[in-house]
């Protein structure tokens, strides 16, 4: 049986080797037939501490690693560039 894979955005990376990933899905309201967004947060294992807040990542289901961690980061699909740009502009202003 294949493992579930989800795509989401890293919300927090303040823990060691753990990131919080928010996965958003769209579903149709049963009565009003309007599409609404629902999101859920997953704790995922990030072995190399390479994920930053805002990155889009692919996570995969795995065995329980701790009380709340049941997922692991497979790959970083898209890096968040804005955080790095603001850091570089602050450094150039100081110099």
UniProtKB/Swiss-Prot annotation:
Keyword Metal-binding: no
GO molecular function per UniProt: rRNA binding; structural constituent of ribosome
UniProt entry keywords in alphabetical sequence: Ribonucleoprotein, Ribosomal protein, RNA-binding, rRNA-binding
Pfam family, one: Ribosomal_S17
UniProt-listed SUPFAM superfamilies: Nucleic acid-binding proteins
One cellular component (GO) term of this entry: cytosolic small ribosomal subunit
Single GO BP term: translation
Recorded family membership: Belongs to the universal ribosomal protein uS17 family.
Subunit structure: Part of the 30S ribosomal subunit.
HAMAP family tied to this protein: Ribosomal_uS17_B
Role of this protein: One of the primary rRNA binding proteins, it binds specifically to the 5'-end of 16S ribosomal RNA.
Protein name in the entry: Small ribosomal subunit protein uS17
Lineage per the UniProt record: Bacteria, Thermotogati, Thermotogota, Thermotogae, Thermotogales
């Amino acid at each position: 049986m294949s493992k579930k894979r989800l795509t989401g955005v890293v919300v927090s990376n303040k823990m060691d080797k753990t990131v919080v990933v928010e996965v958003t899905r769209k579903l149709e309201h049963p009565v009003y037939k309007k599409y609404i967004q629902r999101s859920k947060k997953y704790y995922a294992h990030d072995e190399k501490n390479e994920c930053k807040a805002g990155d889009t990542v692919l996570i995969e289901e795995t065995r329980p690693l701790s009380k709340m961690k049941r997922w692991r980061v497979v790959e970083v699909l898209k890096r968040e560039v804005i955080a790095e740009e603001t850091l570089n502009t602050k450094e150039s202003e100081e110099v």
